[in-house]
Amino acid sequence: MYNVLTDLQEYYETEIRILQQTKERKEVSTLQKNYAIQRCLGASFYAQRLGADFDKIDKLYTKCKKTIDNI
C-alpha cells in the first residue's frame, strides 16, 4: 500500500540534505531556507489532499522546519 507520509518524510530529508550540502560549500541564505520551507509546506498540503493524517503531517513538517531553521 502506498504510504504518503513515508514519501513526505523522504522529501523533507532531501530538502534538508540539499541545504546541508550547500552549507558545506558556502553560507545558506535566509531566502534559501525560506524557499525550502515553502516547498516542504507545499508537499504537506499535497499529502493532506492525498488523505494523510493531518496531525502526522504537522509533526513531520514541524520537525523539518526546525531542522531547516537551524542550518
Where are these regions (language model features)?
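N-terminal acidic leader/helix
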Residues: 1-30
